[in-house]
Amino acid sequence: MVSIAFYGGIPGGISTPITQQSEKSKCEENTMFQPYCYNNDSKNSMAESKEARDQEMNLKEESKEEKRRNDWWKKGMFLLCLAGTTGGILWWYEGLPQQHYIGLVAIGGRLNGSGQSNAIECWGSFPGCRPFQNYFSYETNRSMHMDNNTATLLEAYHREITFIYKSSCTDSDHCQEYQCKKVNLNSSDSSNSVRVEDVTNTAEYWGFKWLECNQTENFKTILVPENEMVNINDTDTWIPKGCNETWARVKRCPIDILYGIHPIRLCVQPPFFLVQEKGIADTSRIGNCGPTIFLGVLEDNKGVVRGDYIACNVRRLNINRKDYTGIYQVPIFYTCTFTNITSCNNEPIISVIMYETNQVQYLLCNNNNSNNYNCVVQSFGVIGQAHLELPRPNKRIRNQSFNQYNCSINNKTELETWKLVKTSGVTPLPISSEANTGLIRHKRDFGISAIVAAIVAATAIAASATMSYVALTEVNKIMEVQNHTFEVENSTLNGMDLIERQIKILYAMILQTHADVQLLKERQQVEETFNLIGCIERTHVFCHTGHPWNMSWGHLNESTQWDDWVSKMEDLNQEILTTLHGARNNLAQSMITFNTPDSIAQFGKDLWSHIGNWIPGLGASIIKYIVMFLLIYLLLTSSPKILRALWKVTSGAGSSGSRYLKKKFHHKHASREDTWDQAQHNIHLAGVTGGSGDKYYKQKYSRNDWNGESEEYNRRPKSWVKSIEAFGESYISEKTKGEISQPGAAINEHKNGSGGNNPHQGSLDLEIRSEGGNIYDCCIKAQEGTLAIPCCGFPLWLFWGLVIIVGRIAGYGLRGLAVIIRICIRGLNLIFEIIRKMLDYIGRALNPGTSHVSMPQYV
């Protein structure tokens, strides 16, 4: 039998002669040159075609690529892209003009009729500032405007309070140093326009010389009279007058609040040391020079007047200044007419306090003739209805010596109107405010640094989850105990208040009883006197003693003891009210301090408020966060194709390019195999025929089968066999074996002509990587230091796992709900079907198809 040899190649392997054996021959599995077993019964099981093997290899690679697309680090890298996009959106959002948001505040108790709250605690912080948390409140619903005759809601009050909020990081209390320069105010008689000019020698305008002062790094500029300032060592540094004088600390003020641990003393209504003269109908008549007390800038000549258009009128002037930045505060000018002014030391400048129903304006006036005064609203000193003492950490009030005075309103009638308002601890409410109300929060710098900080915070939370849980558990226990303690204290204060009221009622009953006893004593004494003297003539109504009436009859001896008791009771009543208010204020301050997040253990609890502070307006509604979370989840889970395409674009390699290179490689490899197979076939034929070409062509065109076990084939030279074996071993290198077993691995790069080269890969000059940029390979190379691609970390994986778990739970819940609805529908359908069949059966029974009842017939 003649054997025919076919020469083909396994991709990436050895091209060996494929032999067809006879039916009697057996397959020898250990034969290197017979990889396929052939017989007449299974002629179709010969070597597969090259295209089929290439297609199978491509399918395997695509299946592996599809599996690798679900790796977790891809999702982590997508989360990084999502975080960057979110940061860009937030960066853009922070640049938009918007309404300022200062977060949650806690408002404590207040007094009836005062219109003032005792404390406000801001939970938000100001960027780059020292802690500025305790505020006092004022009514923001009052409008600021100038009517025909008065300036409502004192602008100095508004400006100073507003500026405290706006520049809290620079300690904007008025006893700081200012950089001032002298200026002139020039105006023409025909207009109300005033020009501000920088000069060395100043002249008076409106009765005063003027300074232009800057504070807080030129953020605020004020135009102020020299009389309100004091120069320091002949430099350009000035401080407000009164900072080194004695300040008034009132003993019994209705309001006594705390600024941190520092007191803020408030006195309201007309100033306690200045009153209007009694019995004078003219409201412009003032008197009482007053004690030597300094509230800001108060000269020795002081007076008080009601806000009346007859006394003072607003003079509207337009201040023209060169270009400036920040706030430029201009004064308010008044023209006043005062009659019968009594000067204590004959000085032309006096301080006038003009009070109205809801405001107090402090004026600095200069006499230009007998009764006419030019007045300017003071920039410092008393603000609104309250005098503030705001000490600074480094520059405090110099030579602090406080005089004790009693408020004139602390009589029995006036004090009873100041009752404590019942409060239940601290009430949180959100505050958002425009610039004209004073509660201002400048936008926080937000950008990539904040995103990095958020990622670091997330890592810290993930690393210390157990410790944070334990700490928060302990904090919750402490909070519960302290809340119960505050409730007990609040109930105690309420009980003390009720006891105080009960004492008042008891005191009134005692007074009434005392009056009745006095009357009884007087009547008894008169009757005893009449009984001693006797009656000359007695009727049922009259008793005529015959003696003239003596004034001592019926007059009881006066005792100062009872009056002392009454005075002490009134004093104790006032002390009780003061103590109750102080206790209430301390309780509110304790609640504020307690509710202020100030420990690491409360960081997790406080994280939500920090997010609300970073994203103004959005933090006020938890619904928006929930909606945003659901949208992100739907985007990540419902759009896998879009995400896959996005990832292919961002990964950089592109699978299409790698496939093209692989196809080029396979084509070159196939053509090289064909050439090599032909050469090996010629070598084999040469060995078989002994170099005879005629014998080769005879065997080629012969129809007889060729058997590879022929004697001529077995008698081929030993050297040729060894060369074939050596060539096979060199062709199947370790790298090539790896490619056959792992089609996704890389092929060794082409080496040029020296030492260990494969002469059959001379045309291969390509460097192929699996899919050109797989994340797994990139991360491996990044760990080896050959490629700088960031691999994903544990926090992102943890966050992604949390998102998937929550989504899966929600999905299971929805699917369970769908199953329940489906079961209910099937049950209802079954019930309806049973009812239908019963009705149909009853109907058929009552209405049969043929009637078996025969009707009677009449013949």
UniProtKB/Swiss-Prot annotation:
Residue intervals annotated with topology Cytoplasmic: 636-859
Source superkingdom: Viruses
A family per Pfam: EIAV_GP90
Family matches, as CDD domains: HIV-1-like_HR1-HR2
InterPro entries per UniProt: GP41-like, Gp90_EIAV
PTM info: Specific enzymatic cleavages in vivo yield mature proteins. Envelope glycoproteins are synthesized as an inactive precursor that is N-glycosylated and processed likely by host cell furin or by a furin-like protease in the Golgi to yield the mature SU and TM proteins. The cleavage site between SU and TM requires the minimal sequence [KR]-X-[KR]-R.
Segments traversing the membrane: 615-635
Glycosylation sites: 40, 112, 141, 148, 186, 214, 233, 244, 340, 368, 399, 406, 411, 483, 490, 550, 557
Region feature Fusion peptide, mapped onto this chain: 446-466
GO cellular component: host cell plasma membrane; membrane; viral envelope; virion membrane
Coiled-coil intervals: 576-624, 663-699
Maturation propeptide residues: 1-6
Protein purpose: The surface protein (SU) attaches the virus to the host cell by binding to its receptor. This interaction triggers the refolding of the transmembrane protein (TM) and is thought to activate its fusogenic potential by unmasking its fusion peptide. Fusion occurs at the host cell plasma membrane.
Name of the protein described by the UniProt record: Envelope glycoprotein
Organism name: Equine infectious anemia virus (isolate CL22) (EIAV)
